Amino acid sequence: ATEIPDSLFEQAIACIKRFEGWHGKHLPYVGWGHKLLPGETFRPDMSKAQADSLLRADLRKLCRMCSRFGKDALLVATLSYNVGYYRVVGYGKIPKSRLIQKLEAGDRDIYNEYVSFRCYKGKVVPSIERRRKVEYMLLFKK
């Protein structure tokens, strides 16, 4: 597995916090966008330190799950944090995204595929598009 530099990981954390914002009253999301899983008892009024720790644990877990993508692991993990791991990599009846198909084929020309994850209910959302462009600019390494 490719080692992710701490500075790059910190940029991903800052980027997620910036665009995700604080989820204080939006269950099932808490903290910086953590989706509550069955059995979890995190509360919307958690401290910022607790939420930061949870975000880091979530992103590290996703990085491990995405480690097969080498230097693109952090980029794919950051996208997965927001849209869901299986929507990106596929599972069962959910097909692999075009982004993953290209990466698996060794094609790293993925800007358009990455930024295509910018819709909500079938419509392009400008703020999500901005987020994808910033994530790509910060985290894609040649």
What are these regions (language model features)?
Residues 1-26, 34-41, 46-65, 85-142:
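Long, amphipathic alpha-helical surface segments
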Residues 74-87:
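Short N-proximal segments of mature Sec-exported proteins
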